[in-house]
Amino acid sequence: TVVSQVILKADDELRYPSSGELKSITEFLQTGEQRVRIAQ
């Protein structure tokens, strides 16, 4: 998922996620309900 990809990339580079990466996680989490509805 987007969340694990962002965390793993930052971890590999020995840094915290950037503000842009954190924003992409936030957007991913905010659209979760919509993705679940589509999947049903």
Swiss-Prot record:
Record's subcellular location: Cellular thylakoid membrane
GO biological process, one term: photosynthesis
Matches recorded under SUPFAM superfamilies: Globin-like
Primary location group: membrane
PTM info: Contains one covalently linked bilin chromophore.
Record keywords, A-Z: Antenna complex, Bile pigment, Chromophore, Electron transport, Membrane, Photosynthesis, Phycobilisome, Thylakoid, Transport
Keyword Thylakoid applies: yes
UniProt family annotation: Belongs to the phycobiliprotein family.
Quaternary structure and interacting proteins, as annotated: Heterodimer of an alpha and a beta chain.
Protein name in UniProt: Allophycocyanin alpha-B chain
Organism: Mastigocladus laminosus
